[in-house]
Amino acid sequence: MRVRVRLFASLREAAGVPEASLELPPGATAEGAWGRLVGDFPALAPRRASLAAAVNRRYAAFDTALQDGDEVVFIPPVSGG
């Protein structure tokens, strides 16, 4: 199955791309998508502990199963004032 991953803020800067298309096995989870993304963009690896995930514009746990065509967004912490 294929999913689209969108990257924002520090994740986009670390990967050097705004999005990626990933081929994943059936039953893959958001965690699996993150692992595949880190395989393609190793600079992302240290950022996992502070991320949230969203699937199809809804916050989702990292163990959420993905479907073909899903859009996955990994969200870094937001700060500012």
Task: Please provide the spans of the model-predicted regions.
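Ubiquitin-like/PB1-type beta-grasp interaction modules and other compact soluble beta-rich domains
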Residues: 1-80
